[in-house]
């Protein structure tokens, strides 16, 4: 009965594929906990979480695209003002995605249980044993002290970045409204 527009069919097909892939990742993740140790790999957990965020973001993008079709004239009048803001917000969204993945590593390794004090990790801000694994770079993915420290530092960075971006955006939009 042609209830779904033809241009929407490829987008819905991608959603269907991503959902199936999520199921496959979920099975693969749980399979890692069905052996001797009843826990899942932090890598598989993080991949499963990351794909879930991608699916959610894609669904929002498609939904907002449907709304945008009816609001196109409003968007073109504001496009000159908001181009830089839009690009910056995409970059921040990407950083938020990596923050979520970092949280997946914290959850998968149970690193959050190692230091339950905040803002200090134990008695210091920078804990002892940071990046002590060999090879050095593997600490970011497998050492619980380093994983939790990185997650916290990423949170501080994003807080400052988003706060600064919010102030910049408000000022930019206020000045453009005053000029018009």
Model-predicted regions and their roles:
Residues 1-180:
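Polytopic transmembrane helical bundles with strong interfacial aromatic enrichment
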């Amino acid at each position: 009965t042609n209830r779904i527009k033809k241009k929407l069919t490829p987008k819905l097909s991608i959603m269907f594929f991503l959902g199936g892939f999520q199921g496959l990742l979920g099975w693969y993740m749980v399979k890692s906990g069905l052996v001797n140790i009843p826990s899942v790999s932090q890598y598989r957990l993080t991949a499963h979480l990351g794909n879930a965020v991608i699916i959610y973001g894609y669904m929002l993008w498609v939904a907002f695209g449907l709304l945008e079709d009816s609001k196109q004239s409003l968007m073109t009048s504001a496009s000159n003002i908001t181009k830089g803001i839009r690009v910056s917000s995409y970059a921040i969204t990407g950083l938020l995605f990596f923050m979520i993945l970092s949280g997946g590593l914290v959850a998968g390794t149970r690193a959050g249980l190692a230091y339950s004090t905040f803002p200090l990790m134990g008695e210091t801000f920078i804990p002892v044993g940071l990046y002590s694994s060999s090879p050095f770079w593997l600490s970011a993915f497998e050492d619980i002290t380093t994983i939790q420290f990185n997650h916290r530092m990423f949170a501080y960075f994003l807080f400052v970045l988003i706060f600064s971006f919010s102030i910049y955006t408000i000022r930019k939009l206020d000045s453009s409204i005053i000029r018009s």
